């Protein structure tokens, strides 16, 4: 058949039509039922006429390539992780959502959240993804920048001051800053007054942009030491270690992952998955995965080191803010037997919807 090669990838690419058809049927059967497919059943459903013996020969070649395996003696075949990746890359057809499907997603996320704050909308997005995927729907939200209300500089030592930033909902952030040599108390007050005059109703990134546009005003209104103080105050808040990092994971549909578990080993893998999801580093890793490419990313089993022990698949896409920055991610986690062709466009559209809605509410 000409599929044996020193390069597995070359051999896979050279699979003939009947090998591809048999492989495709095995994977589709697995995704639909989770059960192995044997040569006798395959010979009945193939579009070409092949005996069970001929099918077994093809299956043997596919197994040698690492695309399929036999879960136990005398069983049919299931796809390996490599086989699933090959199927997703080479065979899977992802279509556009129908108008009805888009309207259904819009309705669930918009209406069920009742126009409430962003967190309610994210909850509904996670719940909706869980419902359509039969996996666990997830939404990761990044730390949002508070709307600024007031700033104050309090001298602690001759060369140090406490910069106090008060945001909407009375969030307070304190940072210690180094003072320029020779700065006076009146200059501390002058710098704070200048910031307060320009910060009302703005986030810190917006304030930074505005001050950049107002360079001439800054030069005219403030002396050199006060200008330096303003820049130091903004810089120390911009350097917050939590800025832009995910702070919340919203996950719905964990019970879906309990369905179809075969025994203690599956329960242990599921426990590992839940443990991973509770770690802060895991949230950052998921967001990094979403950022590492355009559109929807698919990670199968151990391709994603985060979930390699639990053998789970992750389908994830980023959502963005008004400045087109990635500020979070939506996705689905589940067993490798996910309906990838259906879930991918759902995740993609949901990410776009969340981007639009969060921009209007943030």
Swiss-Prot record:
GO terms for biological process: negative regulation of DNA-templated transcription. One of its GO terms (molecular function) is DNA binding. InterPro entries: GAF-like_dom_sf (IPR029016), HrcA (IPR002571), HrcA_C (IPR021153), WH-like_DNA-bd_sf (IPR036388), WH_DNA-bd_sf (IPR036390), WHTH_transcript_rep_HrcA_IDD (IPR023120). The keyword Transcription regulation applies. Pfam families: HrcA. HAMAP family: HrcA (MF_00081). This is Heat-inducible transcription repressor HrcA.
